[in-house]
C-alpha cells in the first residue's frame, strides 16, 4: 500500500475470447511505485482508521518484460498457491488472539465481585462463557492443525482450508464478544485489546475470500465425492 516500494499487479494478458480457461489468462507483474503513470489516489480508511490500503490508478504504465513473475498465464495459480498457506497462518494467528482474550476473560471472571461480594465465577452464565469459549478455541485449534498436517502430507487440503477459513473467524468473534461482555465498558475501551481483535475477526470473514464462497466450495467438494458413489472420510 502506501509504504510499498513496488506492487505486484495481477492482470489479464490474453483476450477473454482466446481459447483456454479464464484463470490461465492472468499474469503477475512487478511495478515499482515510482514508475511513471502509477498514481496513488488516497489511503483507504479501514474500520474508521487510517491504514496502508490505498487506491491506485495505473495510467499507461510500462515496465520491462523482466518484471514479469513466472510464466505468462500462471499468475492466478501462483496466487492460489500462496493463499492456502496464508489462510492457515491467519487462522493460527487468530487462535493465539482467542487464547489471549480467553485468559483476560477468565481473569476478570475470577476477580470481579458483584452483589454481596460474590465472584462472577459462581454465576452459571459466566461458567457458560468459559465452557463455550474453551470449545470454540479447542475446535478451531484442532481443525487448523489437521488442515496443516494434510497440507504437509501432500493430500488435497482444499476442503479443510475453506472449512477453517470460515469456522475460525466465527469462533474468534464469539470468544472476543464474550470477553467484551464480561469486561463491560472497559472491554470496548482502548485499555484492552478486544476492539482490534473484534475488527480483525470480522475482517477475516471477507479477506482472502468471503464465507459464502468457501461454503460453496465445501459443499461442491462433498457433493462431488457422493456423486461418484463415495462417502466423505472424516478420518483423513
Language-model-derived ranges and their functions:
Residues 25, 52, 162:
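Exposed loop/turn and edge beta-strand positions of beta-sandwich/beta-sheet ligand-binding modules
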Residues 19-23, 40-42, 65-72, 230:
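Short, charged, solvent-exposed linker or helix-capping segments at domain edges/interfaces
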Residues 1, 21-23, 45-50, 83-93:
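Short alpha-helix boundary/capping segments
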Residues 31-62:
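Flexible, small-/acidic-enriched active-site or ligand-binding loops
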Residues 1-40:
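A short core secondary-structure module
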Residues 35-37, 47-49, 72-76, 194-198:
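Short, surface-exposed loop/turn microsegments at beta-strand edges and helix-strand junctions
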Residues 55-60, 65, 74, 80-236:
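Alpha-helical interface subdomain recognition
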Amino acid at each position: 500500500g502506501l509504504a510499498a516500494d513496488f506492487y505486484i499487479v495481477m492482470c489479464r494478458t490474453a483476450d477473454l475470447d482466446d481459447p483456454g480457461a479464464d484463470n490461465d489468462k492472468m499474469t503477475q507483474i512487478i511495478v515499482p511505485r515510482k514508475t511513471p503513470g502509477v498514481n496513488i489516489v488516497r489511503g483507504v480508511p479501514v474500520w474508521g482508521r487510517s491504514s496502508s490500503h490505498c487506491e491506485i490508478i495505473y495510467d499507461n504504465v510500462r515496465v520491462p518484460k523482466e518484471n514479469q513473475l513466472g510464466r505468462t498465464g500462471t499468475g492466478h495459480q501462483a496466487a492460489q498457491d500462496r493463499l492456502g498457506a496464508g489462510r492457515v497462518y491467519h487462522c493460527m494467528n487468530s487462535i493465539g488472539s482467542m487464547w489471549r482474550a480467553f485468559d483476560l476473560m477468565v481473569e476478570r471472571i475470577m476477580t470481579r465481585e458483584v452483589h454481596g461480594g460474590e465472584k462472577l465465577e459462581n454465576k452459571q452464565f459466566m461458567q457458560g462463557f468459559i465452557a463455550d469459549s474453551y470449545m470454540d478455541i479447542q475446535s478451531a485449534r484442532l481443525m487448523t492443525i489437521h488442515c496443516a498436517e494434510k497440507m504437509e502430507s501432500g493430500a488435497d487440503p482444499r476442503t479443510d482450508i475453506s472449512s477453517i477459513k470460515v469456522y475460525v473467524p466465527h469462533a474468534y468473534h464469539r470468544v472476543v464478544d464474550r470477553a467484551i461482555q464480561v469486561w463491560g465498558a472497559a472491554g470496548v475501551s482502548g485499555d484492552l485489546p478486544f476492539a482490534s481483535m473484534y475488527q480483525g475477526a470480522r475482517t477475516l470473514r471477507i479477506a482472502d475470500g468471503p464465507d459464502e464462497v468457501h461454503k460453496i466450495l465445501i459443499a461442491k467438494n462433498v457433493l462431488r465425492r457422493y456423486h461418484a458413489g463415495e462417502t466423505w472420510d472424516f478420518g483423513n
